[in-house]
Amino acid sequence: MDIGIDLLAILFCVGFVASFIDAIAGGGGLITIPALLMTGMPPAMALGTNKLQAMGGALSASLYFLRKRAVNLRDIWFILIWVFLGSALGTLLIQSIDVAIFKKMLPFLILAIGLYFLFTPKLGDEDRKQRLSYLLFGLLVSPFLGFYDGFFGPGTGSIMSLACVTLLGFNLPKAAAHAKVMNFTSNLASFALFLLGGQILWKVGFVMMAGSILGANLGAKMVMTKGKTLIRPMVVIMSFMMTAKMVYDQGWFHF
């Protein structure tokens, strides 16, 4: 598939903007996947290429959070294992079953997340009581988070952040940091399976990854410096935008 320099430059910018937003609130796929589909590549290849570029951004943000000691891998290694396994299972299933019913339910889930953050203004302002241990979170919650990202994906960062705030008691910046490390883990599992299926356009993926790394690093810095004032409105806005796009794509308002 031949893609010119001008289009590659646009995709580089798309990767930058999407990963900047994704590092803060999730929802970067709302931007990158339509951009990839508009190049004319098949949907499966667009998803695989998106996982490649997203993995670069997620790794960049994760390394930044690790350097700043916002995340301790010794605390969450068990969680990450189950996120990886859940994502692998979701990626395998998405290639073999009909997801029409799930797609119709998804806008309500994403909208609920946005409304929850909107109407609980003090949620995540500071650390709260931890409701689940890391072990129980890993066993009971992580497989579903990974499965969702591998199976479908939109809003994964917001869902992971919400889980960290409500179940692990994290403040919003800490939740966003842990969500990004989990997101990298789930992306890695999905990428490996798309790689085995040959569904990656490498040139496009690497160009977008370069932009993604820069955008994610900047977004991660914003989380650490302006997290409390920035994350909540970004999560709400991205949740509403994702809901609107999914509703439109499903033809709810086509007459």
From Swiss-Prot:
Membrane topology: Multi-pass membrane protein
GO CC annotation: plasma membrane
Pfam family, one: TauE
Keyword Transport set for record: yes
Alphabetically ordered keywords of this record: Cell membrane, Membrane, Transmembrane, Transmembrane helix, Transport
InterPro entries: TM_pro_TauE-like, TSUP
Membrane-crossing segments per the record: 7-27, 28-48, 76-96, 99-119, 132-152, 153-173, 191-211, 235-255
Subcellular location(s) per record: Cell membrane
Recorded family membership: Belongs to the 4-toluene sulfonate uptake permease (TSUP) (TC 2.A.102) family.
Protein name in UniProt: Probable membrane transporter protein HI_0198
Organism: Haemophilus influenzae (strain ATCC 51907 / DSM 11121 / KW20 / Rd)
